[in-house]
Amino acid sequence: VYMQDTYFAQVAEQTVSNMFSNLDLTKLSKVAQLMGSMSEGRCFSMYSFDEATEKTISDAGFTAQTPSSEEHPQAGVYVTEQNPSKMGWYIHRTSKITRSACNNDGSQTYHVEYTMTNTIDDNQIGIAGAAGTYILSVNADQQGRGVEKTLIYAPAGGSLTNLQTSGGTVTGSRQETLNGKTVYASIANIGPGESVTYSFDVTTSIKAVSDLTLSLI
């Protein structure tokens, strides 16, 4: 496993090196466009421990942030695979947002459903198993399972209520504060063919001028 991780790290390092080598105006323009679209989709993020450099990076939109705009509300749903495996490849994620109320104060209320489905089947488990524990998990009791740490944020200036889960096994549900913001944390353990759905209601700030969207990882 460690040798494979080292290999992927070397590939990533070489890819980034090639991306920024031999830059001309045409290549620089393409790289900038790609970085912008990837950062919007949270496929690319940068952070610097130098405060001045980080401010420049953050102002350019390249540092991933939790929801911060009251005018353009986003609820954050951030998922991190806790099973030492490559099971994240098999976890299919879908979301649904339904407006449920236009409130007198100008805020909007929405119902949100976020579902994670473990799509791996017995045939795929057999194929993946041939690669050893690298794909399915180094932990024998978790092989083929998605173990998803899930953090849910209300939109800036808004609120989140009626959080419920269904399907699979969800443990460690708690409300805590992270970097000054309220976050709803839990662990979803999803077996082969199983799904876990998080459902909750979101009310935006009265300053909202656009519909609710989700900020996802």
Where are these regions (language model features)?
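Lumenal/extracellular ectodomains and adaptor appendage modules
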Residues: 1-217
